[in-house]
Amino acid sequence: MIKDGKISNYQFNKHIDEFNELLLRNLRLIPSYSKSGGSDANLDIINNYKKELNSNTKNSKKTYILTRICLSGSYLPNCLLIDFTLSYDDFYMVPVLYFRAFKDNSKSTSGNIDETRVTPIVSTEELVSNYYSVLGLSSDSNLGPTVTLDSHHLITDSSVWFYVHPCETLHRLREFMEADNCLLPCDSEQLQVVKYLSIWYATYSLGGIFPSISLRPTSQP
């Protein structure tokens, strides 16, 4: 069970598959964030997989989920590609988001992507500009928490990633969960961890940075 408002690396690894299923089912754009009501903006999941890194023990094993999404507007010739990972930071004892973004000027009507014509976005100013443009957002819209550039803590390549520093995450998540009383004693550990990750997603993960990209279930008839 979750204690003192935090989960362990072991709990993250154990229940990340359930949260990933929730992510794949419910990741969508919120129409109200678009000038046109969202009809001209689309979100497509291009890729999603889990990677487990070698470790001597089950408790110290490191796992991350990598997802690629494409944000596009039907009236624009380009789209915004976002790769993001969900992983666990041992020092801060919280989940952490890393993401990188690309401008794609060659997305065909069939949805195929020419990787040779994808341009990395390497500044927050360029990221914000492309995000506004693709989704048709007004220039006075704001992104969520401040992001910085860094290398990925688990992926050892030359890529530069955006990320939200996790120094305040534990304190803030504890406050949110206590205020909403969202973790019930009768909940299973799996349900508690999935709830915890959902709150984290909305505040310090992709949904916190890009408020229009939400984990919102499809309305039931």
UniProtKB/Swiss-Prot annotation:
Active site: C167 (glycyl thioester intermediate)
GO cellular component term, pick one: phagophore assembly site membrane
Highest taxon listed in the record's lineage: Eukaryota
Gene Ontology terms, MF aspect: ubiquitin-like protein transferase activity
A Pfam cross-reference name: Autophagy_act_C
GO annotation terms (biological process): autophagy; protein transport
Membrane topology according to the record: Peripheral membrane protein
Subcellular location: Preautophagosomal structure membrane
Keywords, sorted A to Z: Autophagy, Membrane, Protein transport, Transferase, Transport, Ubl conjugation pathway
Annotated EC: 2.3.2.-
Cell membrane found in the keyword field: no
Biological role: E2-like enzyme required for the cytoplasm to vacuole transport (Cvt), autophagy and nucleophagy. Acts as an E2-like enzyme that catalyzes the conjugation of ATG12 to ATG5. ATG12 conjugation to ATG5 is required for proper localization of ATG8 to the preautophagosomal structure (PAS). Likely serves as an ATG5-recognition molecule.
Family, similarity comment: Belongs to the ATG10 family.
Assembly and binders: Forms homooligomers.
Name of the protein described by the UniProt record: Ubiquitin-like-conjugating enzyme ATG10
